[in-house]
Amino acid sequence: MKEECDILIVSNYYDPELGAAPKRISAMARGFVERGNSVRVLCPMPNYPKGRVFGGYRNKLKVREFIDGVCVDRIFIYPSKSQKPFVRLLSMLSFSISLAFYLPFLNVNRTKLILIQSPPLFVSFTAVFLSNLFFKRKICLNVSDLWPQSAVELNVLKPG
């Protein structure tokens, strides 16, 4: 598969992780491929739901693999399931920082659409900002969850 792609998806979750978000994003990427598009997914090393990088991906800064015709670039994340707000914040910020170093160097000459999955807020903000700054391509921000939930999980807001 070539370096270039028609559609770039930036997501915090992707197969083989468990849960609705990785399954939904994976199905969407496969659907784009089935319709004749080349697709690249940029995501962190798989770590959800346990907050530990899965075996085979540990101690790596970048892994490229092909799953069902989709080019998947996995980059560094500091994963955590800690209940401490600072540690959770650090975990969320780590993928955004990795994006800041990786995204500007992608070859997007042929890319027609950049689809950014949100939440988390930091990832979507970083991806939208850098995509607008460097690429000038159509951006679709897919908000699949309530943003206040992120604040509840960080203990910044209380439920209810």
Regions inferred by a protein language model and the residue ranges of each:
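N-terminal subdomain of nucleotide-sugar transferases
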Residues: M1-D68
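Hydrophobic residues in well-ordered beta-strands that form the structural core
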Residues: I9, V41, R74, L141-V143
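Active-site loop signature of alpha/beta-hydrolase-fold enzymes
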Residues: P16, N47, S80, L146-Q149
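Glycine-centered short loops/turns at secondary-structure junctions
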Residues: G36, F135-K136
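A conserved catalytic-core segment of Leloir-type glycosyltransferases
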Residues: C43-L106
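Short acidic, glycine/proline-rich loop/turn micro-motifs
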Residues: Q83-V87, A151-L157
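An aromatic- and histidine-rich active-site surface loop
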Residues: R88-L103, T111-F135, L141-S144, Q149-S150
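Active-site-proximal region of nucleotide-activated glycan assembly enzymes
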Residues: R137, V156-G160
